[in-house]
Amino acid sequence: MDPVDPNLEPWNHPGSQPKTPCNKCFCKVCCWHCQVCFLNKGLGISYGRKKRKHRRGTPQSSKGHQDPVPKQPLPTTRGNPTGPKESKKEVASKAEADQCD
């Protein structure tokens, strides 16, 4: 490796800057163009100013999206309609009857 002139600034050293300028292309070659391109394009890290995302205004026809919810039929219950408490009592009474036999 050739010795570098000590009076030269680091950013002016030979090979410190690419021969072509950076562009907005995201292809594999352009992602490896320089360290800045690699950070921005390859890794998606940018320390620049963030752009504001514009919020879309609500259309005039909609009133705050306050549409009524359509009524749905109640779900039908399956199994024993009397509930689990009475079924436990029935099981207990059957168990007592079996013990007596």
Curated annotation (Swiss-Prot):
Family assignment from sequence similarity: Belongs to the lentiviruses Tat family.
Record region (Interaction with human CREBBP): 1-24
Pfam families: Tat
N6-acetyllysine: modified positions: K28, K50, K51
Protein name: Protein Tat
Cross-link (Glycyl lysine isopeptide (Lys-Gly) (interchain with G-Cter in ubiquitin)): K71
Modified residues (Asymmetric dimethylarginine): R52
Processing and modification events after translation: Asymmetrical arginine methylation by host PRMT6 seems to diminish the transactivation capacity of Tat and affects the interaction with host CCNT1. Acetylation by EP300, CREBBP, GCN5L2/GCN5 and PCAF regulates the transactivation activity of Tat. EP300-mediated acetylation of Lys-50 promotes dissociation of Tat from the TAR RNA through the competitive binding to PCAF's bromodomain. In addition, the non-acetylated Tat's N-terminus can also interact with PCAF. PCAF-mediated acetylation of Lys-28 enhances Tat's binding to CCNT1. Lys-50 is deacetylated by SIRT1.
Segments of this protein annotated with the region Core: 38-48
Gene transcribed to yield this protein: tat
Biased composition (Basic and acidic residues): 85-101
Binding residue positions for Zn(2+) 2: C25, C27, C30
MF-aspect GO terms: actinin binding; cyclin binding; metal ion binding; protein domain specific binding; protein serine/threonine phosphatase inhibitor activity; RNA-binding transcription regulator activity; trans-activation response element binding
Positions of Zn(2+) 1 binding: C22, H33, C34, C37
UniProt keyword terms in alphabetical order: Acetylation, Activator, AIDS, Apoptosis, Host cytoplasm, Host nucleus, Host-virus interaction, Inhibition of host innate immune response by virus, Inhibition of host interferon signaling pathway by virus, Interferon antiviral system evasion, Isopeptide bond, Metal-binding, Methylation, Modulation of host chromatin by virus, Modulation of host PP1 activity by virus, Phosphoprotein, RNA-binding, Secreted, Transcription, Transcription regulation, Ubl conjugation, Viral immunoevasion, Zinc
Residue span of motif Nuclear localization signal, RNA-binding (TAR), and protein transduction: 49-57
